[in-house]
Swiss-Prot record:
Keywords: Acetylation, Cytoplasm, Ribonucleoprotein, Ribosomal protein, rRNA processing
The species this protein was found in: Saccharomyces cerevisiae (strain ATCC 204508 / S288c) (Baker's yeast)
Gene3D superfamilies: 3.30.1230.20
Originating gene: RPS21A
Disulfide bonds: none
The protein, known as: Small ribosomal subunit protein eS21A
PTM remark: N-terminally acetylated by acetyltransferase NatB.
Any single GO BP term: endonucleolytic cleavage to generate mature 3'-end of SSU-rRNA from (SSU-rRNA, 5.8S rRNA, LSU-rRNA)
Pfam families: Ribosomal_S21e
């Protein structure tokens, strides 16, 4: 689709689930997008710096969202020493 200036404009940009890498459909009303702020040495949030995670309704309905969020945050270096059942 084009706007009045002739630029291509997409009406819908699909997201992918951060945990399963599946595309989140437009009618998945149980999906969430979570922003986790990066913090400095004093534990204060750094303005404008965050990591975004999208979790599908499938992951949430299976009760795996908390473990998936912990795993993703550990892989990105945001969490340390979190106990996991899978280890």
């Amino acid at each position: 689709m084009e706007n009045d200036k002739g630029q291509l404009v997409e009406l819908y940009v699909p997201r992918k689930c951060s945990a399963t890498n599946r595309i989140i459909k437009a009618d998945d009303h149980a999906s969430v997008q979570i922003n986790v702020a990066k913090v400095d040495e004093e534990g204060r949030a750094i303005p404008g710096e965050y990591v975004t995670y999208a979790l599908s309704g499938y992951v949430r309905s299976r009760g795996e969202s908390d473990d998936s969020l912990n795993r993703l945050a550990q892989n990105d270096g945001l969490l340390k020493n979190v106990w996991s059942y899978s280890r």
